[in-house]
Regions:
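Membrane-embedded helix bundles of polyisoprenyl
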Residues: 47, 53, 137-156, 160-244, ...
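Start-transfer (signal-anchor) and selected internal transmembrane alpha helices
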Residues: 1-58, 258-264, 343, 349-359
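Periplasmic/ER-lumenal interhelical loops and adjacent helix-loop junctions
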Residues: 71-87, 256, 263-264, 269-344, ...
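Membrane-interface coil-to-helix junctions
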Residues: 51-145, 172-191, 295-318, 373-385, ...
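Extracytoplasmic
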Residues: 290, 436-601
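Signature aromatic-anchored transmembrane alpha helix within multi-pass, membrane-resident enzymes
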Residues: 14, 261-268, 411-444
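Membrane-helix boundary/interfacial segments in multi-pass membrane proteins
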Residues: 67-70, 180-187, 298, 316-326, ...
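Membrane-interface helix-loop-helix junctions at transmembrane boundaries of multi-pass membrane enzymes
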Residues: 246-260, 339-382, 419, 423-429
């Protein structure tokens, strides 16, 4: 037997699709009572304290931040933060930067420029630097995401506020979320997703549609990948719900459509130009690199523990993946608990059935093009092999579909706590509490490891570079031709406030066939230097190679060539550059320099 619609939901207004869904979700639902204000305050304090705990290593090294498992994206997002300040200080185009990838620039709209956060944080970046702003983004993102799910759960889904507290706790601090702290603030900041999902399900008026359109617009400037996943999850949820309650869904189609037009009109008007710029503007591209589309989830990863969890912190990377993409490392105890919830509430909770299907669909998509078990391919054609050639699907990293399981499990956990609170069996209440502790304690979040970044050469921090680089020319740092070196190069430019244009860097841009790729297409000089970096072979430079170098310098509008002592095969690179330029290097603070202004003229 199903419970009546709670009084609190009845006060929201005319029953909507969302209210009907909630009505079916709790046969033993606790009596809905207004959440006390002190509970809301306690939730914020708890979530903020946990967020500070997770990011404590970053705060300790705030003056020279480097995430141990951060990879490449930390450098890009610090770049994006400074780019946002240049919108105000230099009138730079928010959607495009000429300072990276000289002479072509970078399409920031096509690179997750995170304008929805970097622009509001511009004062923080200007006053305290990009490392502080980056850490604020991560700390605030964890807190806000947990609180957003708590708010939606406590106001609209469950009647027992501790159930919402548990749901919000998992939604904000699940292993997948904490792992994204290793470099993806766009994926950590999911605070709009619960409101978008709720508004989409309960859409019934033009006013609702306008609000949803504004939320969608903001989310598009945070992360479009999450927006696509949210829309897909809502579609699957409603489709499954319609199978069990077709009459209810049919009755709400017309009110939904009356709000949908307002959503499309609002979001369409606000996003028309940014989306055009993203897909057809300068340095736009189509799809992700092939190597990224191959990133799938190993089946065994679901039962494994993440590096960011209590039981595995400090351990070596798992053979099933590593930070920051341990999106589905839930651990076997939690999977067992979720299975018990589904069995317990399946027959009486329509929403549990729909959520279970959503979880299975997204878990399957996260497997990627091929299905692997323990690192071994067991199925050559996985679920994504059927979809990754389609628009939108070709722009999603497959393993990140697993992030959608986090809010699904969070809602199921909230349902279970809410249901346990209503039972008259004390053994069930206490027993279920022990089950949740056993399932959640092993995956409790652990601080993300951080360390001090390598110092920036004094040549850049002192401003000495100004003597060599006119405003219309660029700097070619040899390190940028190899993967890790491109991050170093961006850090050096960040230290100057992106005051000069740099060659190369870490970003997504077009190859000649317009497909997406990391970094620019390689020029002949870059190919020559990469070969030395990889193999360390000494090379006697030919006249043709010198001519290609001069052509590349002119193409880049490079004023100087800089080599860091930290570059692999430093001596061989120095020797080759001496030959290419026809002159020995100048030693400047922290680096070697070749003045090539006479070659680029």
């Amino acid at each position: 037997m199903e419970a009546p619609l709670p009084d609190r939901l009845a006060r929201v207004g005319t029953p909507s699709a969302a209210q009907a869904i909630v009505q079916q979700t709790a046969p033993e639902r606790s009596a809905a009572r207004p959440t006390p204000r002190w509970a809301d305050a306690a939730a914020v304090v708890l979530y903020l304290a946990l967020a500070c705990w997770v990011t404590s290593g970053l705060w300790r090294h705030i003056d020279a931040l480097a995430l141990v498992n951060g990879g490449s994206d930390v450098h890009f997002f610090e770049w994006a933060l400074i780019h946002a300040t240049r919108i105000f200080t230099h009138g730079e185009n928010p959607l495009f930067t000429p300072q990276l990838n000289a002479p072509n620039g970078v399409n920031m709209m096509a690179n997750t420029g995170l304008l929805g956060l970097t622009v509001p944080l511009a004062p923080v970046t200007l006053l305290f630097g990009p490392a502080v702003a980056f850490t604020v983004m991560l700390t605030g993102g964890l807190t806000a995401t947990a609180w957003a799910w708590y708010h939606v759960l406590s106001r609209h889904i469950v009647g027992y506020w501790p159930a919402a507290l548990v749901g919000g706790l998992f939604a904000g601090f699940a292993p997948g979320m904490v792992n994204q702290v290793n470099g993806h603030p766009d994926l950590v900041n999911q605070f709009l997703i619960p409101f978008i999902v709720w508004r989409a399900i309960s859409l019934r008026t033009a006013r609702d549609g306008v609000v949803l359109g504004l939320l969608v617009t903001w989310q598009a400037f945070l992360n479009e990948e999450l927006l696509f996943q949210a829309g897909l999850a809502v579609a699957v949820f409603v489709a499954v719900y319609a199978v069990f309650r077709p009459a209810e869904v049919r009755a709400r189609v017309r009110p939904f459509l009356s709000g949908l037009w307002a959503t499309l009109l609002t979001a369409g008007a606000l996003l028309a130009y940014p989306l055009w710029f993203q897909f057809y503007g300068p340095q736009s591209y189509r799809g992700l690199p092939e190597i990224v589309l191959g990133y799938g989830t190993d089946v065994r990863a679901f039962a494994a523990f993440a590096q960011s969890s209590l039981v595995r912190h400090g351990a070596s990377h798992s053979s099933y993946g590593g930070p920051p993409e341990e999106n589905t490392f839930f651990g076997a105890p939690l999977l067992i608990a979720v299975g018990l919830i589904v069995v317990w509430l399946w027959r009486r909770h329509v929403a549990v059935r729909a959520l279970t299907v959503v979880a299975l669909v997204f878990a399957a998509l996260s497997l990627g093009r091929t299905v692997k078990v323990g690192g071994h391919t067991v199925l050559q054609h996985g679920p994504m092999s059927l979809l990754d050639h389609l628009q939108l699907f070709d722009s999603v990293v497959p393993t990140r579909f697993g992030l959608a399981l986090v809010p699904v499990i969070a809602i199921l956990l909230a349902f279970s706590v809410d249901a346990a609170a209503t039972t008259s069996h004390a053994w069930l209440r206490y027993g279920w509490t022990l089950v949740l502790v056993a399932a959640l304690l092993p995956i409790a979040p652990w601080p993300v490891p951080a360390e001090r970044a390598a110092p920036v050469p004094g040549f850049f921090t002192s401003g000495q570079w100004h003597q060599y680089v006119p405003d219309d020319e660029s700097v070619f740092v040899v390190n940028s031709v190899f993967w890790v070196g491109s991050f170093t190069t961006m850090d050096w430019d960040n230290a100057t406030g992106q005051a000069y244009r740099m060659v190369g860097g870490y970003f997504l841009g077009p190859f000649p066939d317009a497909s997406g790729n990391y970094g620019p297409p390689l020029r002949p000089t870059a190919e020559l230097l990469i070969n030395i970096v990889q193999y360390g072979a000494s090379t006697r430079i030919t006249a043709a190679q010198r001519a290609a170098f001069r052509a590349d310098v002119r193409y880049w509008h490079a004023a100087i060539v800089v080599l860091s002592p930290a570059a692999p095969h430093y001596d061989q690179l120095r020797n080759v550059l001496d030959q290419l330029t026809g002159r020995p290097a100048q030693r400047v603070p922290g680096a070697l320099l070749w003045d090539v202004r006479t070659l680029s003229g």
